[in-house]
Amino acid sequence: NELTAETIQTLAARFPGFYLFKDTSGNDHVARSSLDLHGIFLVRGAEGDYHRWLTNAGGPYNGFLLSSSNVFAEQLTAIRSMLDEGQARAAAALSEQMERVIEKCFKLVKGFPAGNAFANAIKILDHIMAFGEECLHRDPPLLYSGVRLPVEFIEYAAGLLRQEELFPARGYIS
């Protein structure tokens, strides 16, 4: 289900406590509408083209609310800063690096029988960002079903991060 821009406008006018709207549709109808949304903070919840969607790049969103934000917080912050500094090409290049990693990780886990592909891909990437070089010496993420994601997934994703020069020198936990 997707709320219309008109519905969001009506809700924003009626309820002053309604201050944030997250669009996960990927269609971006609300953000692209020309309606007065009464100052609602718009965040995008769909992956991809990170450098194109923020207001400082001419896009309609104030920020992101993504699962990958936990993995790529530093990079998303850098994209925003690059855009603020007029470095659109550098922001686009970093965005593309992240997109390639995320897309390949989604494909990697697609047929895994436990969990869902989106959550599994993010768990793998977060595991690597948490432990850095130690990621292969730690147990892989444990899913709610009690199944661990395969270490081969961690190895593959670590290779992707290295290839894109996004592998952390030090994990945020280690």
Segments (PLM) and residue ranges:
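C-terminal alpha-helical cap/extension of soluble enzyme domains
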Residues: G59-P60, S69-S174
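Catalytic alpha/beta core domains of metabolic enzymes, predominantly
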Residues: N1-A114
